[in-house]
Amino acid sequence: MIESFNQFGSSLLGGFWPVVWNLIKIVALIAPLMGCVAYLTLWERKAIGWTQIRPGPNRVGPWGLLTPIADAVKLIFKEIILPTAANKGLFLLGPVMTIMPALAAWVVVPFGPEVALANINAGLLFLMAITSMEVYGVIIAGWASNSKYAFLGALRASAQMVSYEIAMGFALVVVLMVSGTLNMTEIVLGQDRGRFADMGLNFLSWNWLPLFPIFIVYFISGLAETNRHPFDVVEGESEIVAGHMIEYSGMAFAMFFLAEYANMILISALAVTMFLGGWLPPIDSVVFNWIPGWIWLGLKTFVVVTMFLWVRSTFPRFRYDQIMRLGWKIFIPITLIWLVVVGLWIQSPWNIWK
């Protein structure tokens, strides 16, 4: 069907069709993503409410389902106030620089064997490079606001994000070693072979089982990378009010939160792709194979995102020195040790990734 539509568009628009086709694919990717981001805010409030034995939002629309729309309307019509002493150009650039990497990184995420906006050979490298740019938006926002609270929040954010990017990067390098490729589609397909996969137990052949400590390091680093609880000292309300976002209002303020929730979904989707078999069904059966791969990817991503929310409703906030100690003295040494262990494992007769 997609190929027929592509051929029809090519015959209709000729040389302009590739540009139009890419724009259609971008809109088809970004529009559902923004819808997921909006309703993730509702799911977070509902999940935390149930954890605390209360109903959560239930006033706007049936069962509170229109709450994200009400929030969006409220923020759209709020004024964006520019502080007098702020650098106005950089002040407005900060939110854009924060949300753009969270959206651009999705172009290499595979939703199926041949379903990706850009199935490039260096997909994992591209994703790691593009997501590392988000820290610049936070630094620009903190610097341009000309506020001591915003500047302190930006300093905290940059140090925390850079620290945990190292641990997360090493964790992904371990997956790269066992997969032998940077192509994210091939990384998923590589998890569909082995003794357990031959038995139909696909979920036991995924990377989470042999690389379980690395999976845990990746998940916790993802919490810190997205400034989620218990690593949310960047916007610690009791210390620096709202951190680098303190001077923002309206849609400029909303873009920071859109970026945070989009990054949560991206980190979760990357965890699913690297460790949980991507679009592959957990069991090789007629019923499970009938379900489209993008639904499996979405369900697994939903479970991982819910783990983010569960952590928020369970653990207290860490002190900043505890966060730095965890990243530099525990996670980075663990990932370095596992790099050596996996390297020796691959060269041994017990290599399970052949």
UniProtKB/Swiss-Prot annotation:
Organism: Methylibium petroleiphilum (strain ATCC BAA-1232 / LMG 22953 / PM1)
Protein name: NADH-quinone oxidoreductase subunit H
GO function terms (MF aspect): NADH dehydrogenase activity; oxidoreductase activity, acting on NAD(P)H, quinone or similar compound as acceptor; quinone binding
A GO CC term attached to the entry: plasma membrane
Family: Belongs to the complex I subunit 1 family.
NCBIfam families reported for this sequence: PRK06076.1-2, PRK06076.1-3
GO biological process: aerobic respiration
UniProt-listed PROSITE patterns: COMPLEX1_ND1_2
The entry's keywords: Cell inner membrane, Cell membrane, Membrane, NAD, Quinone, Translocase, Transmembrane, Transmembrane helix, Ubiquinone
EC annotation from Swiss-Prot or TrEMBL: 7.1.1.-
Catalytic activity: a quinone + NADH + 5 H(+)(in) = a quinol + NAD(+) + 4 H(+)(out)
Membrane topology type: Multi-pass membrane protein
Enzyme superclass (EC): translocase
Name of a matching Pfam family: NADHdh
Membrane-spanning parts: 12-32, 62-82, 89-109, 124-144, 162-182, 203-223, 239-259, 263-283, 291-311, 326-346
Self-association and partners: NDH-1 is composed of 14 different subunits. Subunits NuoA, H, J, K, L, M, N constitute the membrane sector of the complex.
Function text: NDH-1 shuttles electrons from NADH, via FMN and iron-sulfur (Fe-S) centers, to quinones in the respiratory chain. The immediate electron acceptor for the enzyme in this species is believed to be ubiquinone. Couples the redox reaction to proton translocation (for every two electrons transferred, four hydrogen ions are translocated across the cytoplasmic membrane), and thus conserves the redox energy in a proton gradient. This subunit may bind ubiquinone.
Subcellular compartments: Cell inner membrane
